[in-house]
């Protein structure tokens, strides 16, 4: 499951419902004989940082490093005990798979607790909707500053989440 799929648990938890879905745009469902042929293997995945404010994950290199140089890191940084690895100067060698995993869980857990503290389902949906809108605004600021994020780091998933929440509100009468 990718990072965006993990973060999808936020709108789902807002209403204790599985009315939301987020996929890989059917690219993993396409059958290809090449998937079954012997290969030499792939490379290690590129290191990522889960951004609560963006509700996505960013590449450590070049995205976190560049956003830090542009003084935009505070706007995308999650509250995490592992931030000392990315600031004041990024040390990507210390950002191990274990730390990345623990950081990801920490961010998701913090967001879930914050959302659950909102009380009613309507308040939870308002909260998560506001978080998504703020994330979209932060993406807009990054784009206006002339920095293009990797397609997997971008905010294209946010509009789908807003539409799903809106549809759910309509169907549930919330």
Model-derived features: positions:
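Short beta-strand/loop segments at the ligand-binding rim of alpha/beta enzyme cores
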Residues: 1
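Catalytic cores of alpha/beta
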Residues: 5-19
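C-terminal structured domains
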Residues: 10-14, 27-94, 98-99
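Gly/Pro- and small hydrophobic-enriched strand-loop and loop-to-helix capping segments
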Residues: 18-28
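C-terminal extensions of enzymes
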Residues: 76-174
């Amino acid at each position: 499951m990718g990072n965006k799929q993990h973060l999808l648990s936020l709108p789902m938890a807002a209403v204790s419902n599985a009315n939301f879905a987020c996929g890989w745009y059917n690219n993993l469902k396409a059958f290809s004989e090449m998937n079954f042929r012997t290969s030499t293997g792939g490379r290690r995945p590129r290191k990522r940082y889960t951004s609560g404010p963006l509700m996505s994950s960013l590449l450590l290199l070049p995205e976190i490093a560049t956003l830090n140089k542009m003084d935009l890191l505070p706007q995308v940084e999650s509250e995490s005990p592992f931030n000392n690895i990315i600031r004041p100067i990024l040390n990507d060698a210390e950002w191990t798979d274990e730390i990345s995993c623990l950081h990801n869980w920490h961010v998701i857990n913090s967001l879930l607790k914050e959302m659950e503290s909102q009380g009613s389902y309507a308040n939870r949906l308002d909260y998560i909707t506001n978080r998504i809108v703020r994330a979209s605004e932060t993406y807009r600021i990054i784009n206006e500053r002339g920095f293009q994020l990797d397609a997997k780091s971008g905010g294209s998933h946010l509009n789908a989440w807003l539409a799903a929440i809106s549809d759910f509100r309509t169907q549930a009468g919330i």
